[in-house]
Amino acid sequence: MMTLLIAAISTPAQAAPVAAKPTDRIVFLGDSITQGGAGPKGYVTLVRQKLGDGDAKGAEVIGAGISGNKVPDLEKRLERDVLSKKPTVVVIYIGINDVWHGERDPAKGTMPDRFEQGLGGIVEKIQAAGARVILATPSVIGEKKGGANKLDAKLDQYSEITRKLAKDKKTGLCDLRKAFADQLAKANGADKEAGILTTDRVHLNEAGNAFVAGEMLKALGK
């Protein structure tokens, strides 16, 4: 009972969706996963199509992903690529490179305290501009189950930072880290390192893009 209570307090996975409306301008901010998500079968495109078929028809969906980006990069281009577009909703899917790039040289990644400070500041600036925010936890660097991937513990740490910020800043949450773990536990019977939801342990294949689109739509109340 105590374990369940602690989990409920520490993981705000039941955060209320940021319901998309026909008048919304939604910006997806992130790295190469989001850049690729703007392609023909990418998750950003799939979200746009789904919203266009439903009660949020008319909502504008903009991809703002750049390959290799980490939190400090988002800080530098926030005004140009996000705030200047006058969004009403901003979805931030970041953290993979903050962990991955620091695997061999910590100076090339983003330390946890810097990640928290930077991401929190980005959220505050977006909220000050009047937009709602959805934070997405970083998904995977390797698809093996049960914490067997080399950087799983680090990704879990950065995901927990993201969940905490979502709770503290009262944002929406798309907990991709948990969603991927749950899906791979069911779908990765051969315990493969890649090929279920990713092409290369990180970047999404067609199934992965469809999966992320579904999770994002849930966070958008669809």
Predicted features along the sequence, with ranges:
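Bacterial N-terminal signal peptides
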Residues: M1-S10
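Membrane/wall-proximal cationic-aromatic binding patches
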Residues: Q14-F28
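Alpha-helical cap/lid subdomain in secreted, periplasmic
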Residues: A20-K21, L46-K57, D73-K222
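Catalytic nucleophile-elbow at a beta strand-turn-alpha helix junction centered on a G-D-S/GDSL motif
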Residues: D24-G39, S67-K70, V99
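A structural signal for the hydrophobic beta-strands that form the central parallel beta-sheet
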Residues: F28-L29, G63, L135, T198
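Short Gly/aromatic-enriched secondary-structure transition segments
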Residues: K41-T45
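A short beta-strand-loop structural module common to alpha/beta enzyme folds
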Residues: G54-K70
